[in-house]
Amino acid sequence: MAPPGRPGRWQDGRVAGVARSMGVRHSTGTGPESGLVYEIPLRTRFRGVTVRQGVVWRGAAGWAEWSPFLDYGPDEAWIWLRAAMESADIGWPDPVRATVPVNCTIPAVDPEVAYAMAVGSGCTTAKVKVAEQGQELADDLNRVEAVRHALGPTGQVRVDANGAWDVDAARAAIRQLARFDLEYVEQPCAHVDELAELRRRLARDGIGVLIAADESIRRSNDPYRVAELRAADVVVLKVQPLGGVRACLQIAERIGLPVVVSSALETSVGIRAGLALAAALPQLPYACGLNTVPLLTDDLVEASLVATGGHLTVRDLVVDPLRLSSAAAPSDVVEAWRTRLREVHHAMAEMQSGEGRIV
């Protein structure tokens, strides 16, 4: 086995044979066109998502995953593809650490379920989803309280609103949530100027809860506005949405704020790229949101990237041909992803010609 984090050291066993048996030409150093389309249900609805789909393939440097959410158009999905191509064709920078601290992720579930998930994770940090459509602030308070009890006074609890609140609603919610000694609130409002205004109001109120920016980084034409407007205390970086490990390292260096590395709800194939980023960062002051494979009902590798004692080990992965076969998407889904890939290639061609968004 190669040292932790070295690119390209994935073993695939009988994967090529499995792919051929499904009528999909297996990728051996080519690209996503010959990859395998997977479909894996989630254990619990997560921000409206009940199933994850994506494409995996093996390039010259290793395995890669391309899995932009279905509501992402070509103008965003091509950036995810660029990240996957880095994993497949180039590999990742050398790591500076062998393990990465991680949080557990608690969906918008009942308090009893939230408590059990937090205890069962073995993590000392939890990220709790709040502001779920169809729920009330009281639901959030009960869920966060349950997680706080599960982790005890020394645990870290952060919440994520995914931009669902306006400034007034965020201020009101945080005033109540602050009693649970939050580590930070992730993306309470959708827009950068709203985050900046919220931070000013919280400071005037004497509420010392930190603000983290996620969507304002990964879905922005200018991620650095977060720092320029003093809109956040922490930034969340996700490898696929931001175009790869090296692109994220550049943002981390330039933005001048503490970084948390999180997943985009991928299989272990995609999580491994996030782990490579977390392992390569010079400083890692917070637990990372990379322990999300337990939210899936299945995976694509023999030994999934699941936390032990609140940490993930930076290690090589072995793709499981039986799991690949089990997760193979039906033909209509495969065709939809082929169409999507063609649209993304067109968008990438436009980017290379100087039109559109460049990250």
What are these regions (language model features)?
Residues 5-179, 205, 301-359:
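N-terminal capping/lid subdomain adjacent to the active-site entrance of alpha/beta enzymes
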Residues 40, 105, 214, 262, ...:
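Conserved beta-strand termini and adjacent loop/short-helix elements that scaffold enzyme active sites
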Residues 62, 257-261, 284-286:
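A short pocket-lining beta-strand/turn micro-motif at the edge of beta-sheets
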Residues 133-276, 298-300, 305:
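Catalytic core of soluble alpha/beta enzymes
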Residues 276-283:
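Oxidoreductase and adenylate-handling cofactor-binding alpha/beta cores
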Residues 283-294:
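Short helix/strand-capping turn motifs
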